[in-house]
């Protein structure tokens, strides 16, 4: 077996002890709650038989070929989730997950040497609930013996370009918790498995490492990168996935699979394949065993040349394979027997059923020194002119709906945690966060939020989100009634983005409650559609505050034309309630008059400004021409406008067309939507706006609120016209004279920042075939350029593709509509309905000094992702209980969190348990002006108002292992030795967060009983 690997904590394969109460704290009674004890029992490492200990024996001195039987089951793509599970619409795609799992389990039970891996808990959990107790017991035994192994373990195999890190963590937690609850430590995945996502982010690897994974296997990487890795024997190495976290916290061993995730040529034995079976009867005229064995031996020898050890893998399966598992296993049984029989003739090839975990174990035991990777795997191309950078922006409406749903889910989770059981059963009925949790998890799938599914499947994704919002709205209503001591008919305006809200538009009086999911106070301008008139707005202390009614541009809404504006201040993790009343005609002059946009005369200089910022517009073109930071005395010429790339349908150089996945413009220079904009101006005491109309399908409002340190650009694009038979990919572009040396910066899943360079890859010499598409990168929350003194940052409200194709330039793709499929399997052009979609979104623009930039964009991006939730009511309802005094303002925290600290997760985990994640949201050395990149310490024990923490247990990021007992394999690298410190004992009164560190806790709590005021 060779020398065993080094491990931290318990030895691989488990020990004989359960969880010790290490890295935890007893804050109250010495008796642990039953739910907590049950959780400890499930996660006891002493029970971990399924892991490295159950791996099959290999043969030293031979080339060991690990066959990895697997299926790749998309959670929606050409068919919906339900259609895939049940096997509906076989004429679209022959695929049925329920039959796959039935068949695999049956085949595994036939022979003890057979093995299989499974990934998607969205499917497996559904199948599991439909099984008999006998079948469940049989599956538990298979898992315990390592014959059925779970890899990844998330609800889905998530996308890595269009996903926010918080949503990734949530979906992984959901899937891994199902495995923990169902199989205990036997079901603990040790390996991450992303074989189909179209490029890989550095933050994804960091998150996996923090979840306790030992390794990460990839299917798709750039074709040039792969060739280079094969030549340099770098198909496997250590990914150091953070510049801030001290190694090995974000280190993850990463391997590139030899054949994406498909079986080798001629060795596909699924009902969906056409390769002949193994015929081992020499009397048969179809006898092919000898030929297949010789082919296999040559294939194994050739593949070994690209890897460093005497172990290699072959993925035996593909999309929705194993519906008839017997076909696969019967032929692999023969292959294994026939190939291994050649050892008596001198063959040095040993083939075996295996799993990614067992393969990783052998690599670790080899005790080699591995190279280190520090960048990411974007952008991905599978051939010349074939860059998968279009999906960064595909289906922007779905991308925004997903981001809004993440926002609302955190609100729902937090209120459920703050209030406890009364949020689930209250005056408005039964509330539940689970449906939205599951819908959001499904949306992280690499064909969901990516925008790469068929239109009917996209519609179904939206349906799932909408269905999840309902139970959460009930829960939020119950919780707000409990916290405010008042029962009201709450209304959730889901269509505020298109200026529709029936309560505010039809009511003479109403109340506006804003819940703030951040751990710090937030000031925000509220905008609500109203019918023409003037209004009095009162704050939570019943004092009149400033408000304005402004006209909405006619190209925004055909029905309602006015919006009410007022400034709101909402405490940390709490709410504020404002009352609104329409004034009678007699009182109009006592309040601000309505503000209508005024046509701008070209000979006047056009400026909008407040005490912090000024934006100047070209009076001839109507375009933005300069931004000034008055606070820091910075001025930058900035021209912003909308352009579109003419989408390729294929040409003489390549047949590749632009599509849902691929971005390929016909030419490198985009076409302006218009070289000028028709403009009008709104100026009130609260806001100054320039309304720009570029065309019938493209408009924008550039606004500056009172006291705001950033410029807001609210764009409306679509339906994109295609009657000219030209597909169009629309960008918003900012041009400046900044000298940026061909460099720009993008975020990785909303967290750490990566430097990008045009026409450059850090680990190989790039042959650039697409100078536009090949320089596009995913932008989840921000992109910026800098000259070393000033920094221009643009924040997004959804994931988009972005780049800087010329010095001082920055562009983001906001919408795309295409007429041709890109030949990647969807077989449907990205038309988005017959007429196309109209999409509205926001870009927030910051101009600041480099030293101050991080403090600005970190906090603003956090507020953009987790904005206050607006809830309306008519007021005047009954008290929550007798003698209750209504509350119009509330905070769930005893004190605000420091600006460095983000409350990433606060959610119910059990009847008396909560899940808590605290995050340091600044990178190392990122902020010097305010010292925000320094470690910060806080008291968790006395942090919350509504409950008392009795016990606190620190866990890995996905909350499925105690941190003190988490065991990860150790690896030697060419960068030198790495220290492996033991987790320190937890003191809940003094929890320290280092830059970019996330700490995860499970807490046993007691909610306060409500007392009549």
UniProtKB/Swiss-Prot annotation:
Organism in which the protein naturally occurs: Mus musculus (Mouse)
Any single biological process term in GO: learning or memory
UniProt-annotated location(s): Lysosome
Comment on bound cofactor: Binds 1 zinc ion per subunit.
Described function: Necessary for the catabolism of N-linked carbohydrates released during glycoprotein turnover.
Protein name in the entry: Lysosomal alpha-mannosidase
Binding residues annotated for Zn(2+), in chain numbering: 72, 74, 196, 446
Entry EC no(s): 3.2.1.24
